[in-house]
């Protein structure tokens, strides 16, 4: 039997990159997966390619979206065993050039969106879970910048640091429901957020506005050299790290921040 056979999972930001790879990994290990993404076409395409998966596109920066997304997962599966809070993006700026809009946007998607998803899930848990329930899993995606900080990444780092606080607090609140809550803090992973914008500019549409995403070739090379392994991680590397926190073998691990950074420690 696959290790996640009979389990159900919600993965946010699952249309591309880490989220897509995670949805595929969990499904390959037996879980039924709800694929959430801002981009409806992408979410539908990913779900259609995963046996038994369900697509539910939604903009998680809409305060009303989280209740609807969690409700859709509960309706589709009759319960929810795994929540992976992955949705997010990067908006670079040094503090002297940072607008209130940039600050608010990074806190909104990385902290507030996770809070709302977990609040909705928590309301269901209080009615349906106990210490005798099968172990359920929450995995919140943070970043090494949320642990160590990062130049020109104040808002992003603050949002990802908030994820750490959310994780450690809910691990204490939800242990009595037999729910483990952990975070995975990634270093540089090869996604469109870290692809070279000199070669092919990547535009992400958020709330109807375009955001340029990506890194310079110089930044990409620096990220590779910072790792003792000499490379950036792949989405599959990231998904494997998340899977470990969803698997039965991690049932006694909670409240932890797992650094999956290729050995980068600053």
Predicted ranges, named:
Residues 3, 148, 241-243, 254-266:
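Short C-terminal tail/terminal secondary-structure segment
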Residues 3-34:
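Canonical Rossmann dinucleotide-binding motif of NAD(H)/NADP(H)-dependent dehydrogenases/reductases
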Residues 94-95, 102-107, 212, 223:
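Substrate-binding pocket helix/loop in short-chain dehydrogenase/reductase
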Residues 118, 159, 167:
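Active-site helix of classical SDR
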Residues 123, 172-173, 251:
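Alpha-helical segment proximal to the catalytic Tyr-Lys
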Residues 143:
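Residue(s) in the substrate-gating loop at a strand-loop-helix junction
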Residues 175, 180, 253-255:
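Short, small/polar-rich loop/turn modules that mediate ligand/substrate recognition or access, typified
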